[in-house]
Amino acid sequence: FLDYGSGYSLLKAIDSLPPNTKNVTFVEGDLFYTEEDFTKIIESKKNVVSINKEPIYANKAVVLYLDTQQHIHYLYDTAHKALNIKEPFCAIFNSAQMWKFNDTNYLQRVRKRLTNEQEEGTNLELIDAYFRDLENGSIDIIPIETWYNCNTVKDYHHVYKFIKAHENN
C-alpha cells in the first residue's frame, strides 16, 4: 500500500471478492461527504461515477471527461503540475472519487487484463478501463453536493468548521 496507494487496495479487494458479489463501491479514504450523498450512490441500480462542484486544478483534481463518443475517461497528474487531454471531449468534471461497479464479473475481467505497469499505477488505471467501454445507459453520473478532499491540515480544519456549523441541524 505504501508504494501503490489505494489502487493496490482496490486490486486486492477485487482479487478477494466472494462469489455472487453483486457490486463493489470504492471511495477514496480522505474524503468528507454526507450520508445523503453517499446513499445516492448506494441506491443507484446502475454503475456510478461521481462528480463534485469544485474547480479543476492540476495540483489536486481528478478529472472525469466524456470523449466525443460519450465514453468516460479519467485524468490525474501525480506530479500535480499540468493536465493534458489529448483528444476532443464533450464534457469535463471534477471527480468526487466515489465509484460503484455493478458488474463484478466484468470488473474481475478488467482487473485480469491490467499490465504490471497498470497495476503499479493509480487506482484510475482500473477505474478508467472499467468505465471506458460501458454503455452510457448503464452509468449514473451522480453529483455530490457536500464534498471535501482532505489532502491538507487546512482541508481538515475546513471540514471541522463545516461539521460544527451543522451539528445542531
Spans of features found by a protein language model:
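Conserved core of the sugar-phosphate nucleotidyltransferase
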Residues: T34-Q118
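Conserved alpha/beta core of the MobA/IspD/sugar-nucleotide pyrophosphorylase nucleotidyltransferase superfamily
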Residues: F89-N169
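Short beta-strand-to-loop acidic/aromatic patch adjacent to the donor-nucleotide binding site
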Residues: T21-F32
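Conserved N-terminal catalytic core of the sugar/cofactor nucleotidyltransferase
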Residues: F1-N23
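Short, surface-exposed amphipathic charged segments that create phosphate/polyanion-binding patches used
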Residues: G7-I14, V62-L66, K154-Y160
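A general structural motif
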Residues: T21-K22, K45, N136-S138
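Alpha-helical elements of Rossmann-like donor-binding domains used by nucleotide-donor carbohydrate transfer enzymes
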Residues: Y8-K12, K40, K46, A129, ...
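A short acidic, often aromatic-flanked loop/helix-cap motif at beta-alpha or helix-coil junctions
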Residues: F1-G5, I56-Y57, A82, W147-N149
